[in-house]
Amino acid sequence: MRKIIVYIATSADGYIARKDGAVDWLDRPRPKGNYGMGEFWKSIDTILLGRKTYDFVVQFVKEGKSIPKQKHEPKHYAFSRRPPKKVLPGFDFVKEPIKKFAKRFRAQKGKNIFMMGGGGIIASFLDVGEIDEFIIHVIPTFIGEGIPLIAPRHRTVPLKLLSTKKFSDGVVRLHYEVVKTKAQARSR
């Protein structure tokens, strides 16, 4: 069965972006191999993102920046109750309930599914038990305040550490499996 994997970078104090969405603190020299991103791209064929992250991508493109092309272009699904009138090529908007969408996609043949973010959509998928793993790259920088990795909720989500890796620039990769409750495991 396909897995839904959050693959993301956070500041050392747990933020994925500044309050205004800026990720300037991510602009830094990267070690050879770009933290294993190439290998990760080979393992996925679908990207999920929330509306705010989609809007960030639109702004990125408007500024004349290009999205790196891959040998195989994954399909992008953005979640929003109010999709925009004009949608970037290669993106579809989803209004379907998350649980229903995830169940349908997990049943299809294919590679793993990349949950790009942001914090709101990650939290929504976690709330219904539909995140399998987190691969978090902790950048050795404090930004003080910003958008948290997961939007605040009153919940506890146990994780099982699968691996760690320290890179030459001080970045640490933490790979976790989300520990499913018995009820979540049965609902699949």
Label the model's feature ranges:
Residues M1-R188:
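Enzymes that bind and transform nitrogen-containing heteroaromatic metabolites
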